[in-house]
């Protein structure tokens, strides 16, 4: 493994990927599926919210199909849904995405993965990106998801589950990310 130096922390460095155009609005009026908002904050090891974090997500559409050439499923594609978004944290250190609840996707060995969102976190001072997942608290399929069940400690497993709520008549899932310390979010090697 190559060694990192302090000046080689993870980006974001390239302005082309950091336009002022909102990249967190993933669900349009005609996007198929249940419209949801995913929001939260990112905390450091001392429990302080971090102000300058970039959160990227990618997910399947409501049918459980990714908008990617390698997804060869017979499920429909939704032309109004790319399945990808990016959000920087705001003045109150919140990130948010307006999206849809994804459908279940195939796993390895003929298993089915519960609806989930894949997440990549980039922040000042991090030497590598951190990857995690968001599962949904109201999904029965979580009980048999092979990735979620690979986290043997149930307390740690809960760090991957967003809590369903409602705000202004809309469905909101709250998912806080803890980079270190008590209740550190489970991260995956990618």
Report residues per predicted region.
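Beta-strand-dominated extracellular/periplasmic modules and repeats
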Residues: 1-190
């Amino acid at each position: 493994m190559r060694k990192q130096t302090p000046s080689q922390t993870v980006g974001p460095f390239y302005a082309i990927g950091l336009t002022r155009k909102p990249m967190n609005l993933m669900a349009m009026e005609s996007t198929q599926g249940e419209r949801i908002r995913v929001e939260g904050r990112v905390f450091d090891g001392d429990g302080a919210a971090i102000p300058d974090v970039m959160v990227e997500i990618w997910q399947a559409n409501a049918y459980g199909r990714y908008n990617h050439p390698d997804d060869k499923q017979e499920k429909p594609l939704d032309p109004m849904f790319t399945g990808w978004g990016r959000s920087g944290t705001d003045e109150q250190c919140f990130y948010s995405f307006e999206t849809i609840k994804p459908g279940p996707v195939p796993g390895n060995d003929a298993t089915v993965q519960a609806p989930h969102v894949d997440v990549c976190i980039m922040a000042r001072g991090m030497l590598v990106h951190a990857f995690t997942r968001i599962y949904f608290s109201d999904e029965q399929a979580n009980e048999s998801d092979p990735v979620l069940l690979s986290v043997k400690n149930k307390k740690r497993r809960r760090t991957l589950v967003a809590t369903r709520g409602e705000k202004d008549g809309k469905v909101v899932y709250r998912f806080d990310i803890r980079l270190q310390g008590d209740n550190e979010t489970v991260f995956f090697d990618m």
